[in-house]
């Protein structure tokens, strides 16, 4: 019950903030990303082999200004594209106005693209410029990185 109360409060705050910024109440675009976090004592955890982290993974969707729309927690060993499919299902029900998603290269998977097409979404994979090293925010995805900040 509390989880739904928190989600409802978050949705209302998101819409009020969008209204204050003179935007439509419901977003039409979202940015997807995930972040692995250490949680050695969590009962439902996994190992993110790429980042060598034992814990959980946050899969998030934010609007064009970085407002949190959805969060999904999974064990860290769940692939980004699998977590994104769960986000797409929830977005279809909760924010039907969102039709376009930006994501990084980890989301360029046939299963995710098929799911997005089936639900009527467009997932645009935004890659870094060739030869780029280290962390540099990518123009269309920086808002989600700032949200993790």
Predicted features and spans:
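Short alpha-helical elements
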Residues: 1-149
């Amino acid at each position: 019950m509390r989880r739904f109360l928190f989600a409802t409060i978050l949705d209302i705050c998101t819409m009020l903030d969008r209204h204050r910024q003179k935007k439509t109440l419901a977003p039409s675009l979202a940015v997807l990303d995930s972040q692995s976090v250490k949680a050695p004592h969590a009962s439902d955890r996994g190992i993110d082999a790429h980042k060598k982290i034992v814990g959980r993974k946050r899969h998030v969707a934010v609007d064009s200004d970085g407002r949190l729309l959805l969060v999904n927690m999974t064990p860290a060993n769940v692939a980004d594209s699998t977590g994104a499919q769960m986000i797409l299902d929830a977005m279809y029900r909760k924010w039907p106005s969102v039709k376009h998603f930006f994501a990084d290269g980890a989301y360029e998977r046939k299963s995710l693209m098929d799911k997005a097409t089936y639900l009527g979404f467009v997932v645009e994979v935004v890659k870094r410029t060739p030869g780029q090293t280290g962390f540099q925010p990518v123009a269309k995805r920086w808002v989600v990185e700032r949200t993790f900040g």
